Amino acid sequence: MVRRTLLQAALRAWVIQCWWRSMQAKMLEQRRRLALRLYTCQEWAVVKVQAQVRMWQARRRFLQARQAACIIQSHWRWHASQTRGLIRGHYEVRASRLELDIEILMT
C-alpha cells in the first residue's frame, strides 16, 4: 500500500514536472517571438528613415543643380542677346554634378 502511494506520488510529481517544463518552453518561445517582432519593427523603421534621408539628400542635390543650370542659362541668354551670337549648348544634370557643353558662334 505504501509502495503504491509512493509510486502514485512520484508519477504525479513527474506529470507536474513535465507540465512545468512545457510551460517554461512555451513562455520562452513567446518571449523569443516578441523580441524578434520588436527587432524586426525597429529594423524596418531604421530602413524607412534611411530611405527618407537619402531621398531628401538626392532631392536637395537635384534642386541645387537645377538652380545652377537656370542661373547659367539666364546669364548666357543675356550674354547672347548682347552679342547677338548663336549659342548652342547641352547640359546634363547628374546626381552629384552638372555637365555643361556650350558652343558660341559669333556672326
Curated annotation (Swiss-Prot):
InterPro entries: IQ_motif_EF-hand-BS, IQCF. It holds the Pfam family IQ. Gene3D superfamilies: 1.20.5.190. GO terms for molecular function: calmodulin binding. Keywords: Repeat. The keyword Disulfide bond does not apply. PROSITE patterns: IQ. Residues 42-71 form the IQ domain. PANTHER family: IQ DOMAIN-CONTAINING PROTEIN F6, IQ MOTIF CONTAINING F. This is IQ domain-containing protein F6.
